[in-house]
Structure formats: C-alpha cells, structure tokens
Amino acid sequence: MPQQTIEELYEQALERKQNPQTGSYTDYLYQKGLDKILKKVGEESTEVILGAKNNNEELIYETSDLLFHLMVLLVEKGVSLDDIKDELGSRLGKKSLLHERADWRGDKKNEKDS
C-alpha cells in the first residue's frame, strides 16, 4: 500500500493554496477562509477522540483527517513544518514540571501540603 509522509501532505496543501483547482475540497477550504478551516480542525479533533474510544481503525481514519486539516491550517497561517520541527526540537531534553502542578495532582487550589 502506498504511503504518504506528513511533509508530502503539507506540500500538497501548499500546492493547492498556490495553485487552486476548481472543485477541490482543499480549494473550497481556502476560499471559505480561516474560520471554516478552524471549524474543521475542531470537528476532526473531536472525531479523533471519539474514534479512539471505538477502535484503532477509526482512530487511524480520523487522525488522517485531522492531520490533513492541520496541514491546511498551517499553510493558511503561513506556518511551515520547519517552524513546527524547530519548536519540537526546542523541547528536547527539557524537564517537565508537570509533577509540580497542583491541578495535575488533583490538589485543591488553596490547599497546603500537610
């Protein structure tokens, strides 16, 4: 089965933005603008959550939809995959302070340790 990388998906979204094709779904999203794209990202995010509750096949399908819509969003906003990779790289090796957050531990906001 052929595979497509995230980079190829991004490049496809960028190509459609630069060279619209009448009747394509991607072109439709770009024509409708940011609000429509954001709505679709929100819908697809919810569908990923629901898919994860059901089965892996549905999770894979819905995640693919979400990734597509995220690529369209990134292109629309002028954010490159290199921008995302740089951000991810800046997080490498950083210690998470999540264990220190009272809200994560379930502590009440004004409750002091005994």
Swiss-Prot record:
It is found in: Cytoplasm. GO terms for molecular function: ATP binding; phosphoribosyl-ATP diphosphatase activity. Signal peptide: none annotated. InterPro entries: HisE, PRib-ATP_PPHydrolase-like. It catalyses: 1-(5-phospho-beta-D-ribosyl)-ATP + H2O = 1-(5-phospho-beta-D-ribosyl)-5'-AMP + diphosphate + H(+). Its EC number is 3.6.1.31. GO terms for biological process: L-histidine biosynthetic process. This is Phosphoribosyl-ATP pyrophosphatase.
